[in-house]
Amino acid sequence: MTDYLLLFVGTVLVNNFVLVKFLGLCPFMGVSKKLETAMGMGLATTFVMTLASICAWLIDTWILIPLNLIYLRTMAFILVIAVVVQFTEMVVRKTSPVLYRLLGIFLPLITTNCAVLGVALLNINLGHNFLQSALYGFSAAVGFSLVMVLFAAIRERLAVADVPAPFRGNAIALITAGLMSLAFMGFSGLVKL
């Protein structure tokens, strides 16, 4: 049980996918202008990353390894992610049309989010079992969502702040992301994996 807690805390805070591994930067910068959109994208990404981790582990363990087709791993995982994203898109469209309109093009772009593919590939490379894979996918997504929501809240405050003209827009956003990354480095000694 302690191992699973350490995996969760380590993935969310210490080895955050956005601020430490630099995966998922496109939606991190693109969808984080409004808190509402960032929260919706975080929830959708959490669902996709968790489900994609589970499906990728199952396909790798039950199909690719027994048939000695591990060279098709990346292609198979991309296809799995595409199917999971389409399923998520249908669910979001039915349950929350407002969120579906807010996310716009970013929802299908979860397919190309390198964090989703990264979590599937890292699960295999780290040798996780089924429960660890599911938890790792969920933890990575929680860390991604946490950083997105924090960053969106900061960006909303910066939008009304008195920022010097050369730093407005993406410049201050990148500086803020760098400062967030430094803040998360404070967790680096918390968990040793």
Curated annotation (Swiss-Prot):
Gene Ontology biological process: electron transport chain
Enzyme Commission number(s) of this protein: 7.-.-.-
Transmembrane regions: 5-25, 47-67, 72-92, 102-122, 134-154, 171-191
Membrane topology: Multi-pass membrane protein
Subcellular location, record wording: Cell inner membrane
Cellular component annotations (GO), alphabetically ordered: plasma membrane
Principal location listed in the UniProt entry: membrane
Keyword set includes Hydrolase: no
Xref: Pfam families: Rnf-Nqr
Keywords: Cell inner membrane, Cell membrane, Electron transport, Membrane, Translocase, Transmembrane, Transmembrane helix, Transport
Entry's family note: Belongs to the NqrDE/RnfAE family.
Subunit-level organization: The complex is composed of six subunits: RsxA, RsxB, RsxC, RsxD, RsxE and RsxG.
Job of this protein: Part of a membrane-bound complex that couples electron transfer with translocation of ions across the membrane. Required to maintain the reduced state of SoxR.
Protein name as it appears in the record: Ion-translocating oxidoreductase complex subunit A
Gene: rsxA
